[in-house]
Amino acid sequence: MVWWVVRTQGVARRKQLMAAGISAEWEAILARNLPPYDSLPAEAQKTLQGYIAVFLDEKQFEGCGGQEITDEVRVSVAAQACLLLIGRKEATCYPKLRSVLVYPHTYVAGGKGIFGAQNDAPSTRLGESWQTGVVVLSWNSVTGGARNFDDGHNVVLHEFAHQLDQEDGAADGAPKLESWSSYGSWARCLSGEYRSFLKRVAKHKRTVIDEYGATNPAEFFATATEAFFEKPEQLERKRPELYEELKRYYQVDPRQWEF
């Protein structure tokens, strides 16, 4: 009974926040740090603002390594993260995510790997997504991704694609889909595209998707998401079946956004 009351209150609050949107000051940050924003239809802009409001209400931000957490940081991260949600009309906003840790620059980390698993080898990182409800980002990578929104590299899109992938408890490149019938098409398309991608990378051929996607299916989904939102025309031309599958999943067509 208590669980039901808490859940109902959460749903009601999200609806209220979605309807209210964000302040003019926050929208100015949004427009400045998310190049596609001005090209979005009015309804999509309103939906994005609503998700940003929910995101900033529910998620905690923590500065690391001397990074100050300002509205610029919070809104910029939330805007890019919530771009992944605007077509899907989710009732929740990254439900398993609790905290976003932000470093000023790339950072060296060991212990936990990109999916929260133990990994003793320290490495320099731009960001991480943990299954324990944490995303880690470097602020200079966030701003770099915002400035160059057509290069196919965006740490926020990448790590939050991992969050979507991890919602079902597994980081395997297969996020929760709309219906059971969708999984067959997804598996056939993504597995075939992944195999084809591995062959091109092995032959050192140029690819629209970052070569890091060859690491495993989870990284392929994350890097394909970056290409889908940032290089949609190229991805559709080179990998039309993959583009259509991602378009069905995200319920948007970034080719229509001119910026």
Q: Can you say where each PLM-predicted feature lies in the sequence?
A:
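Transmembrane-cytosolic junction motif
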Residues: 2-24
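Short acidic (Asp/Glu) and glycine-rich catalytic loops that position anionic groups and cofactors
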Residues: 9-10, 26-31, 56, 200-204, ...
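Amphipathic alpha-helical packing elements
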Residues: 18-58
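Active-site recognition of the HExxH zinc-binding catalytic motif
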Residues: 41, 151-167, 222
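Structural motif
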Residues: 42-43, 67-73, 211-219
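Extended cationic-aromatic binding surfaces that line active-site or macromolecule-binding grooves
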Residues: 46-109
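Metalloprotease/metallohydrolase-associated module, dominated by Zn2+-dependent proteases
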Residues: 78-94, 102-150, 170-259
